[in-house]
From Swiss-Prot:
Binding residues annotated for Fe cation 2, in chain numbering: 83, 166, 227
Keyword Flavoprotein in annotation: yes
Positions bound to Fe cation 3: 428, 431, 461, 464
InterPro entries, sorted: Anaer_NO_rdtase_flvorubredoxin, Flavodoxin/NO_synth, Flavoprotein-like_sf, Metallo-B-lactamas, ODP_dom, RibonucZ/Hydroxyglut_hydro, Rubredoxin-like_dom, Rubredoxin-O_OxRdtase
Location, primary (coarse class): cytoplasm
Source organism of this protein record: Salmonella typhimurium (strain LT2 / SGSC1412 / ATCC 700720)
Protein name from the UniProt record: Anaerobic nitric oxide reductase flavorubredoxin
């Protein structure tokens, strides 16, 4: 069944009420999802994206009921991931010569998934256009690392519809298609959850890319996403939220999460929260036991928070596995402008809290003092936990923006070479992040004073996660 989006544009996608796991099991889609595909019928007929591979046969059957497949003139693939382009093999078996418009990186991804290099690929770049008749064009905009290297958006003139790919979407299933028709609380919760868990690592790319798109001075009457609703009522509201979320976002909120073996660390978490509330009753404090909580809800709360307290019991001298896994995930999400403190209980030997503190610092958090308790905390120990909460509340609520912690030596004191000795600065050609040899990249164990030639080959750009081969000498230093 198709749904009219606007004029000659129809939704021909697939709802998935049952899906509960995405990206393996990394993202819990508790409200299902949809795979949005769009059919445009002008003088030329255009299909934008397909659906998840598990619905390939249904998709092609439904599409055939809408249009003779041989009448499809162009296929646009904004993103090569299987939930977008998964039905290509089934579709191209019917219309093998139909041109597929996508980015150069998408060809590599599509061939990697479908293994059909003979398909009729047409590479497009930012600013390229495709005439579809009736005075209308498609304009392509590359959006690398939002959230794959192959990503792009497609804008349709005349109808002023932006087919935005994953950006501005959400894993949210509803029989109604448009943003003004669905439950608004559910919608915006899922929008923020989607951004926090998927797009946060690329926040530094969001603002310049949105600015670039706005720079085309094109009207936007609708934003047609790849998942969830189509934004037809005040579509720029979600754009404004993205600009807000991309700027080191935080609320007056503290998240506490922990894992525990014998409830001892849970007791500490509760007492710390009590201490925070005593000093600052206005701050929102959320507590999660990771063994019983939705991981993505925890990460969304971390995204919203100004600080996080992480607790773990000690097991075999290390932290609990679920805590270790979640901290590793936070490292990949690259949260910014947030503080952290570790706490936990132990028996005959400790070790977990110290390791946890180190991992949180490696993940980019500004660290406050940690807290340890031996065995089950008694009344005196619980009072120490409450005092720790009071101290945290004062530090995080009243202090200015986080400063460099004492554990990290100031960069100025660690630099022993002059800039001239270290060679040129290098700039990522994709996201424009600059590697300064004088500063190094501590999160990847590249010490200050490391020339680019000595940076390990497995180095990844901290902003877009691409390798050394995309770096060029900074233009201002090139000879």
């Amino acid at each position: 069944m198709s749904i009219l989006v606007k004029n000659n544009i129809h939704w021909v996608g697939q709802r998935d009420w049952e899906v509960r796991d995405f990206h393996g099991t990394e993202y819990k889609t508790l409200r299902g999802s949809s795979y949005n595909s769009y059919l445009i019928r002008e003088e030329k007929n255009v299909l934008i994206d397909t659906v998840d591979h598990k619905f390939s046969r249904e998709f092609v059957q439904n599409l055939r009921s809408e249009i003779d497949l041989a009448d499809i003139d162009y296929i646009i693939i904004n993103h090569a991931e299987e939930d977008h382009a998964g039905a290509l093999t089934e579709l191209m078996a019917q219309i093998p010569d139909t041109p597929i418009y996508c980015t150069a990186n998408a060809i590599d991804s599509i061939n990697g998934h479908h293994h059909h290099p003979e398909w009729n690929f047409k590479v497009v770049k930012t600013g390229d256009t495709l005439d579809i008749g009736n005075g209308k064009q498609l304009i392509f905009v590359e959006t690398p690392m939002l959230h794959w290297p192959d990503s792009m958006m497609t804008y349709m003139t005349g109808d002023a519809v932006l087919f935005s790919n994953d950006a501005f979407g959400q894993h949210y299933c509803d029989e109604r298609l448009f943003n003004d028709e669905v439950d608004q609380t559910e919608l915006f919760e899922q929008c923020q959850r989607y951004y926090a868990n998927i797009l946060t690592p690329f926040s530094r790319l969001v603002t310049p890319k949105i600015t670039e798109i706005l720079g085309f001075n094109l009207p936007v009457d609708m934003i047609a996403t790849s998942h969830g609703v189509v934004w037809r009522d005040n579509p720029t509201q979600i754009v404004e939220l993205y600009l807000k979320w991309a700027t080191d976002y935080q609320e007056d909120r503290i998240t506490i999460f922990y894992d525990t073996m014998s409830n001892n660390t849970r007791m500490m978490a509760d007492a710390i929260a009590q201490g925070i509330n005593e000093v600052d009753p206005n701050v929102a404090v959320k507590i999660f036991n990771v063994a019983r909580s939705d991981k993505n809800e925890i990460l969304t709360n971390v995204f919203r928070s100004k600080g996080v307290l992480v607790g773990t019991s000690t097991m075999n001298n290390v932290m609990m596995p679920k805590i270790a896994g979640l901290v590793e995930e936070m490292t990949g999400l690259r949260f910014r402008n947030k503080r952290a403190s570790a706490f936990g209980s132990h028996g005959w030997s400790g070790g977990a809290v110290d390791r946890l503190s180190t991992r949180l610092q490696d993940a980019g958090f500004e660290m406050s003092l940690s807290l340890k308790a031996k065995w089950r905390p008694d009344l005196d120990a619980l009072e120490l936990c409450r005092q720790h909460g009071r101290d945290i509340a004062r530090q995080w609520a009243l202090a200015p923006l986080p400063e460099t912690t004492q554990q990290i030596a100031p960069v100025e004191e660690t630099i022993t070479c002059t800039a001239a000795d270290l060679g040129p600065k290098m700039q990522c050609s994709v996201c424009q992040w600059i590697y300064d040899p004088a500063l190094g990249e501590p999160l990847q164990d590249v010490a200050p004073g490391t020339p680019w030639n000595d940076v390990p080959d497995n180095f990844l750009c901290p902003e877009c996660s691409l390798g050394k081969d995309v770096f060029d000498v900074l233009a201002t230093e090139a000879k």
